[in-house]
Amino acid sequence: MVVNDTVADMLTRIRNANLARHQIVQVPATKVTRNMALVLKEEGFVHNFEQMGEGIETHLMISLKYNGKNRQPVITALKRISKPGLRVYANHKELPRVLGGLGIAIISTSQGVMTDRQARHDGLGGEILCYIW
């Protein structure tokens, strides 16, 4: 299946897997989705991820994280900000704080994909891909 917006597709798959309390979610692998998965792992939103397959059939297997006996998802919500029809950019001074610092914004900068905190620290702006909390 051809997907135009791989970031939105990734966020939707993670959101649906969280609601269904799935342990693992499969996402098509691109440079951006790999880097976003790495940021999610570094920030503690997912356990781990692994790349499977070769060539055009490459995909990521992302292991989701849950808390407690009731298996509450660590990821409460995901929101796509910059869309193909309306790109949203910000310089390092304008980068948003998600829920007063409780969540993260994933930013695509000239130095790669990173969190809003890292981009602010490095003095970088870029495209605001999504908010996660």
UniProtKB/Swiss-Prot annotation:
Coiled coil stretches, renumbered: none
- Where is it localised? Plastid, Chloroplast
Instruction: List, alphabetically, the InterPro entries matched.
Output: Ribosomal_uS8 (IPR000630), Ribosomal_uS8_CS (IPR047863), Ribosomal_uS8_sf (IPR035987)
> Which SUPFAM superfamilies does the record cross-reference, listed alphabetically?
Ribosomal protein S8
Q: A GO BP term, please?
A: translation
Which Pfam families is this protein grouped with? Answer: Ribosomal_S8 (PF00410)
Keywords linked to the UniProt accession: Chloroplast, Plastid, Ribonucleoprotein, Ribosomal protein, RNA-binding, rRNA-binding
**Listed GO MF terms:** rRNA binding; structural constituent of ribosome
Choose one Gene Ontology CC annotation of this protein and give it: chloroplast
Keyword Phosphoprotein tagged:
no
NCBIfam families linked to this entry: PRK00136.1
Which HAMAP family does this UniProt record tie to the protein?
Answer: Ribosomal_uS8_B
Q: Which family does it belong to?
A: Belongs to the universal ribosomal protein uS8 family.
Q: How does it assemble?
A: Part of the 30S ribosomal subunit.
Provide the function of this protein.
Answer: One of the primary rRNA binding proteins, it binds directly to 16S rRNA central domain where it helps coordinate assembly of the platform of the 30S subunit.
Q: Report what the protein is called.
A: Small ribosomal subunit protein uS8c
Question: Whose protein is this, by species?
Answer: Porphyra purpurea
